[in-house]
Amino acid sequence: MIKTLDNQVIALAGLAQATHLVRQIAQRGSADAGDMEAVVRSVFAIDADDVPSVYGGVDKIKTGLQILDRQLAGFEPPDAELARYGATLILLERKLVSAPRLLETLRTGIEQVKEQAEYFGELNDTVYANLADLYQRTVSQLRPRVMVNGQPSHLTNSTNANRIRALLLAGIRSVVLWRQCGGERWKLLFQRSAMRKEARRLLQSSQ
């Protein structure tokens, strides 16, 4: 992937959208289906032509761009919980890259679930369950774990739990993409203004 600021911002928007949806499901028991499909399908978009295509187009991650715009508004992100989810996934991605066995399990598993998704033609409960299982067998083996806050009734519901884990896996996918596009943690501190400007430009272009 081309290492440009706009590509990094698109990938970060994917991460922001995934973590936002995790919280919505954890707290409300539901989330926007279109927003969810865009980021979850990114897990399967290994051979996309460009970064926007990973999510099906910039317009599919408008929610993530809006959240990213708000999070970059000041030196400290206004939404500490979403920032914590994102920071934990960024840390876990580094650890995953350093664990070849888990990484290979993840790659093989994604290919298998991708075939299932193509067979069903949709992201049904079986696809979400298999993505959740893959997350548990790979990313969940690393520390720290992503501690999701929410209503116990939603968190203990198996359908919701599967969707949350699938979205966390999608978040990892966005972090991998961000790294491939030249993303570095220091840029989150020192390029905030430039990234926010780019997020707003992308939002306007997706109208």
From Swiss-Prot:
It comes from Methylococcus capsulatus (strain ATCC 33009 / NCIMB 11132 / Bath). NCBIfam families: PRK00218.1-2 (NF001246). Belongs to the HflD family. It is a peripheral membrane protein. HAMAP family: HflD_protein. SUPFAM superfamilies: YcfC-like. Its main location: cytoplasm. It holds the Pfam family DUF489. It is found in: Cytoplasm; Cell inner membrane. This is High frequency lysogenization protein HflD homolog. GO terms for cellular component: cytoplasm; plasma membrane. Keywords: Cell inner membrane, Cell membrane, Cytoplasm, Membrane.
